[in-house]
Every structure is written in structure tokens, then in C-alpha cells.
Design a protein with these regions (language model features):
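ATP/Mg2+-dependent ligation/transfer catalytic cores
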Residues: 1-173, 195, 215, 370-432
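A generic structural motif
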Residues: 27-29, 86-92, 149, 189-195, ...
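Short glycine/proline-enriched loop/turn "hinge" motifs that connect secondary-structure elements
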Residues: 70-77, 115-116, 174-179, 227, ...
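Short, hydrophobic beta-strand segments
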Residues: 81-87, 183-189, 236
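Core alpha/beta catalytic barrel or barrel-like domain that forms the active/cofactor pocket
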Residues: 116-127, 136, 167-187, 217-235, ...
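Active-site-proximal beta-alpha loop/turn segments in soluble metabolic enzymes
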Residues: 137-147, 180-195, 224-229, 241-246
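Short, contiguous, pocket-lining structural segments
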Residues: 148-156, 173-179, 191-202, 206, ...
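Catalytic-core signal marking the mid-to-C-terminal active-site face
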Residues: 201, 208-211, 215-216, 239-432
Length: 432
């Protein structure tokens, strides 16, 4: 049973003095969209009678996602409801990423599982120019865990945390990250659909509050050369009857057989999934040696160089950390394909290769080959081609999203390859 009923929403809209409601949904690339209505139309929206484009698709509001925006005026407030998208015949729209995740979660539920996810979202705070336009300038030299006055973004980050808490987030920690102007705010893990919704809200809050401080927040994976990029590590676990099924006290690593199968499924399908977890041309500028980002498809409970890490917490906190995703990934699609891969590992009881407890970046090519360690795709084109050839990904995403996503991403790559970059001008113009 949901948290709110229709009567609850109508009452809260009145009590909160809400004048505008944003009916939010997400496109296949993870970009947040909305249709705004006045409070006079809220009952119509709650009865699923709002058309998003005037004819072809309808928004079905998820009552439990009702929140007011704390940064808006407190008289005549603005609230939001996240919507599922349906066709006029009452069937789910195949292009709705939320529907894709719901399908994967239903498959897990049919096996008795519930998925929990805890993301670690990193971002940069840059200066804006005299016209308020974003730059990549920062005048700070702060690094990991530094604080003010070195951390120029401390005040903005604090206001982000307070705003997120007002919107129901349980913030566990916030701190400066490794690169100058880079930050991380961690919120408590939760059920996968709620967490995916929260990631979209998180990004909206971070960008909005940064702008109020005269800054530009960006989730671009690698906005500057020579520094660490921004990731979105995904900590995942499955529970059954309220118990974390990844934990097993009798195992030497404290992991259950289901956990090993789940990891094997992730590793089996990782190259096919990378175009979803790392969706931009720029994503692959982060996935290079020397900047704390994974490149090789391996796992470990002891070091951070592999793709999959098992954090030290055990018991209820036992989880699998996937370290390649970045914050530009569509969270609904990323969680859906990770869950489907893990479930495939469990269903097929895939054997897991031995862990790699040494630094993979120090292994020779021959040593990696002997251990059957593959690399992630080196660029977006390679990732999309891996995805395009995958029956697993077509089934996981559905024909509608699969076809449109791969086509759009190849177009993005082709557009990129036609650009003449500053690096080319600097290295070739005066030499040839």
C-alpha cells in the first residue's frame, strides 16, 4: 500500500498553499522533463487525465513522490509528482525508463527478491562568467576531505544538504572530493525505484542550489583534463523476507552463493551494459588509468582497482559496489540492466572467476590474459556496438528504448568524430 492516497494529496496541496504542480518524467537519456499544472488541475492529474503531448501519452502520477520545492516562494508553493507514462489504451509506454526498471523489479519480486541501491554521486562546482554562463574555472586547490577556507564550495554544499533533507533525504555524509571543486553528497540506500527517483531529484537540487550561490554544478564525468572525474558508484544488494541474501557468515568472505552468482552476472554482461552506465563520449575520458576509475572487468574484496568491489561491511550491510557508472547515466536504466544481469547470474548459476587482490594496473598484458581479465569498452562507439549486438540488452530494455538509444548514441559519436579539437590545433597546426 502506498504512503499517500488521492485524498492525502488534495489535502496537502491545500494545506501547503501549492499553486503549481510539476508532473515530472524522464526521457531515455535520463533528462528530467515536466508538465506544469495549476492546483485547480490537480484532481484531473490524480485521475490520470493529463496528456503530456496533447494526444499520445498520459501521465499517471505516483502519489508517493509528492514533495514541495523548498527553494521556491513559500506563498504559492511549487510541488512535484513523478509520473509513470502510459498510452491512451492504458498500457505502459515502452519508452518510459521508469517502466523498464519496474519490469526488472517485478522479475526480481517473482524470484522473491527486493533490490536496494545506494549511490555515491560526485559533481563539480565551477565559477560562472559575468553573464552567468558556466565555465570550468575554479580558484580553489582543495582536495579530498578538505574544508573551508580551502573548500570554496562548502557553503553551497551545506545548503544542498539542508535542502535535500527538507525533501526527505537521509544524508549520511558530504565532503570535498579528490579534484579541486569536486564534491560528493551521499544519501542512505533504499529500494531501487525510490533511489532512482531520488537521484533525479538530487541532481535537480544540486544544480538549483549551486545556481543560487552563483556557481554551476555539473555532473559531466570528466570536465577537466588531469584530474579525477566524477563517478556514481552503485552499491547493490538483494533482500528476501527482509533479510540481506548477499550475507553468509559461513563463507570466508562473508558472501552468499547468490552474491557470487550476482557478481558473475554483472561481469558477464558488463561490456554490453557500459553504454548505459557510461553514456557519453566524455564518460570514457574518466575511464583511464591513473584517476581512480576502473577499466578492467574483475572483482575484489581487498582493493579498489577492479570494476566490482565488496565493501567491508557484512551482515545487513553486505553489498556489491559497481564502480564504473557515472552520474550522467539514466538511473532507471542503469539499475534495470544491473539487476537483470545479476538475476541472470543467479538463474544460470554462473561461476565467478577468482578475485584479483593485487593492483590490476600493475599486471602485465600476459598476466591479465592468463586471468581472463577483459577491459571495459574504450570509447562510446565500442560500447554502443557491444550493446547493439546484445540480445540480453534488447530484452532488458525493450525494443523501443534499445533501438532509439543505440541509434542516438551512434549519432552522438559520429558528431564527435567530426569535431576539430583544441588539442589537434595545438599539436598539428604549426607542425604540418
Amino acid at each position: 500500500m502506498g504512503k499517500y492516497t488521492k485524498a492525502d494529496i488534495l489535502r496537502m496541496v491545500k494545506e501547503d498553499d501549492v499553486e503549481f504542480i510539476r508532473l515530472q518524467f524522464t526521457d531515455i537519456f535520463g533528462d528530467l522533463k515536466n508538465v506544469a499544472i495549476t492546483s485547480s488541475q490537480i484532481e484531473k492529474a490524480l485521475d490520470n487525465k493529463i496528456m503530456f503531448d496533447g494526444s499520445s501519452i498520459e501521465g499517471f502520477a505516483d502519489y508517493d513522490t509528492y514533495e514541495t520545492f523548498p527553494w521556491r516562494p513559500q506563498q504559492g508553493k511549487v510541488a512535484r509528482l513523478i509520473c509513470d507514462v502510459y498510452k491512451p489504451d492504458g498500457t505502459p509506454f515502452e519508452g518510459d525508463p521508469r517502466y523498464v526498471l519496474k519490469k526488472a523489479l517485478k522479475e526480481a519480486a517473482d524470484m522473491g527478491y527486493m533490490m536496494n541501491v545506494g549511490p555515491e554521486c560526485e559533481f563539480f562546482l565551477f565559477q560562472t562568467d559575468e553573464n552567468g554562463l558556466p565555465t570550468t574555472n575554479t580558484y580553489e586547490r582543495a582536495s579530498y576531505f578538505d574544508l573551508g577556507p580551502l573548500d570554496f564550495g562548502e557553503n553551497a554544499r551545506r545548503d544542498m544538504v539542508l535542502t535535500l533533507e527538507q525533501m526527505g533525504f537521509e544524508i549520511e555524509a558530504s565532503h570535498h572530493e579528490v579534484a579541486p571543486a569536486q564534491h560528493e553528497i551521499d544519501f542512505k540506500y533504499g529500494e531501487a525505484l525510490k533511489t532512482a527517483d531520488s537521484i533525479e531529484t538530487f541532481k535537480l537540487v544540486v544544480k538549483t542550489i549551486a545556481k543560487k550561490h552563483g556557481l554551476c554544478a555539473t555532473f559531466m564525468p570528466k570536465p577537466k583534463y588531469g584530474v579525477c572525474g566524477s563517478g556514481m558508484h552503485m552499491n547493490m544488494s538483494l533482500s528476501k523476507d527482509g533479510k540481506n541474501i548477499f550475507a553468509d557468515d559461513n563463507d570466508k568472505l562473508g558472501l552468499s552463493q547468490e552474491a557470487y552468482y550476482f557478481i558473475a552476472g554483472i561481469m558477464e554482461h558488463m561490456r554490453e551494459m557500459t553504454a548505459i552506465t557510461n553514456p557519453l563520449v566524455n564518460s570514457y575520458k574518466r575511464l583511464v588509468p591513473g584517476y581512480e576509475a576502473p577499466i578492467y572487468i574483475a572483482w575484489s574484496a581487498k582493493n579498489r582497482s577492479p570494476l566490482v568491489r565488496i565493501p567491508s561491511a557484512r551482515g545487513a550491510g553486505t553489498r556489491v559496489e559497481l564502480r564504473c557508472p557515472d552520474p550522467t547515466a539514466n538511473p532507471y536504466l542503469a539499475m534495470a540492466v544491473c539487476l537483470k544481469a545479476g538475476l541472470d547470474g543467479i538463474k544460470r548459476q554462473l561461476p565467478l572467476v577468482p578475485s584479483v587482490d593485487s593492483n590490476i594496473f600493475e599486471l602485465t598484458r600476459e598476466e591479465k590474459k592468463a586471468r581472463h581479465i577483459e577491459s571495459l569498452p574504450a570509447n562510446l562507439r565500442e560500447a554502443v556496438l557491444c550493446m547493439r549486438d546484445s540480445d540480453f540488452m534488447k530484452e532488458a530494455l525493450g525494443e523501443h528504448i534499445f533501438t532509439r538509444y543505440t541509434s542516438a548514441k551512434l549519432d552522438e559519436w559520429n558528431e564527435y568524430t567530426r569535431q576539430v579539437t583544441d588539442w589537434e590545433i595545438s599539436n598539428y597546426l604549426y607542425k604540418v
